[in-house]
A protein has these predicted regions:
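Short, conserved beta-strand element in jelly-roll/cupin
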Residues: 53-57, 67-82, 121
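A generic "binding-loop/recognition-motif" signal
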Residues: 68, 88, 104-105, 114
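A short hydrophobic beta-strand segment most commonly corresponding to one strand
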Residues: 54, 72, 99, 113-127
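Short beta-strand His + acidic residue motifs that chelate non-heme Fe in jelly-roll/DSBH
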Residues: 62-64, 82-83, 100, 106-113
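A short, N-terminal "cap"/entry segment at the start of jelly-roll beta-barrel domains
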Residues: 1-48
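Conserved short histidine dyad/triad with adjacent acidic residue
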Residues: 32-40, 50-67, 102-103
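Short acidic-glycine-tyrosine-enriched beta hairpin
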Residues: 86-102
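A generic structural signal for short beta-strands and their flanking turns/coil linkers
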Residues: 29, 47-52, 71, 78, ...
Length: 127
């Protein structure tokens, strides 16, 4: 198995990028760049990371939920308000990021007046 892989842009020959609707995600479009179904992380030796981009309309959100994966959310455009269950909301603007361990219940909402584009990186628990 190779130690690296090139991912072609969606629509280009050989691309495995796909768009999907995720449970608990509202008024948004998620695109998975790398994962088990989309050509990674198991397509490279030792690969584990999952990565995608989500576009949120104004008011778009993610309901409170948790997963076992370490998560990093990076705001590319617009703004998002992230909240850890029981905690205070934190406004993230373009260039800001949010990093949490697995098992944390969190929510997100685009509180701005324009769309938000967010890079999402997930690392499943290690065996």
């Amino acid at each position: 198995m190779a130690k690296f892989k090139i991912q072609r842009a969606k629509g280009r020959e050989g691309s495995t990028i796909y768009t999907y609707t995720a449970n608990g995600h509202n008024e948004c479009v998620a695109t998975r760049l790398w994962d088990k179904e989309g050509g990674g992380p198991n397509d490279i030796e030792g690969g584990k990371m999952i990565m995608g981009i989500t576009w949120f309309t104004p008011g778009g959100s993610i309901d409170y939920s948790s997963n076992p994966m370490e998560s990093i959310y990076y705001v590319l455009e617009g703004e998002m308000t992230m909240t850890i269950e029981g905690g205070e909301p934190v406004l993230l603007k373009a260039g800001d990021s949010f990093h949490c361990v697995g098992g944390v219940s969190k929510s997100a909402v685009n509180t701005g007046e324009v769309g938000t584009k967010m890079l999402v990186c997930l690392l499943p628990p290690q065996d």
